[in-house]
Amino acid sequence: MADSGSEPRSLLLVHAHPDDESIDNGATMARYAAAGVNVTLVTCTLGEEGDVVVPELAHLGAAYEDRLADHRAGELDAAMAALGVTDHRILNEQNRYRDSGMMGSPSNDHPRSFWRADVEEAARSLAHIIRELRPQVLVTYGPDGGYGHPDHIQAHRVAMRAAQLAGQAGQADASQNARLPHAVAKIYWNCHPRSAARFSTKALRAEEQTPFLLDESAISVTDDSFATCVIDASDHLAAKSAALSAHRTQMTVQGAFFALSNNVGRLISGEEYYHLAYCRPDLAVDEPEDHAAPDLESDLFAGL
């Protein structure tokens, strides 16, 4: 699985905050890392505005000492170790962006908030990484960021623009002159199909004792038809659970479930879903003549 043509297989994931990667892609990352694929995570902020679920660490939060960033960086290190991923980076690390908080909050207006970042500038920084790593596959969020968080929306914008810039000749600055353009072959957006959300809710309801709440609304779900790929990495479920547990300021993990600060329980699943947002034209698969839904891909590198 480690080779694709003349270059090693490389997977790049772009996320907004520490913990997003473990929630959306933890099993996927562990599977590909174990198979010898070069897996790289780029995190756009260190989640300074995150709610702290551990009472004894609440003083680190933005409303108190505002020292959560360094702590969450350590949690991210531990999560990556659990997943077997050795290359994880902070976007524009020397002048990094700050967590913008939820949409409409005062933290959106912080001078360093990612929401206020210049998309072209941030995209150039990410394009530099793309040219360096030369990934065939890029994973990020869809246009709404999954649930409308400003940093998720901005991560989508930056990742998509960076993929464009990385493939264009003449877009390198002085520090990139030695790096040739690179065209990402496939871009996927994370998604959470409605049927998977229902299965999670059903599993939680069947628990006789749980500290977690049920939520039937699940604002981040998509129609099942939106998913074009499912990665079954159930063999790496323990690694995903360990990675989630590493983000202890942000979530509670108990048995087969986890919950963020809203205490809504979600099943820790080894199946993770994706929507193919872009595919290099020579790799595109034609629609079936009868317009039947095509089978889901089972490999992000399918066709490469």
Swiss-Prot record:
Binds 1 zinc ion per subunit. Catalyzes the deacetylation of 1D-myo-inositol 2-acetamido-2-deoxy-alpha-D-glucopyranoside (GlcNAc-Ins) in the mycothiol biosynthesis pathway. Belongs to the MshB deacetylase family. The keyword Transferase does not apply. Its cofactor is Zn(2+). Zn(2+) binds at residues 17, 20, 152. Keywords: Hydrolase, Metal-binding, Zinc. This is 1D-myo-inositol 2-acetamido-2-deoxy-alpha-D-glucopyranoside deacetylase 2. The keyword Hydrolase applies. Its EC number is 3.5.1.103. InterPro entries: GlcNAc_PI_deacetylase-related, LmbE-like_dom_sf, Mycothiol_biosynthesis_MshB. One of its GO terms (molecular function) is zinc ion binding. GO terms for biological process: mycothiol biosynthetic process. It holds the Pfam family PIG-L. PANTHER family: 1D-MYO-INOSITOL 2-ACETAMIDO-2-DEOXY-ALPHA-D-GLUCOPYRANOSIDE DEACETYLASE (PTHR12993:SF26), N-ACETYLGLUCOSAMINYL-PHOSPHATIDYLINOSITOL DE-N-ACETYLASE-RELATED (PTHR12993). It catalyses: 1D-myo-inositol 2-acetamido-2-deoxy-alpha-D-glucopyranoside + H2O = 1D-myo-inositol 2-amino-2-deoxy-alpha-D-glucopyranoside + acetate.
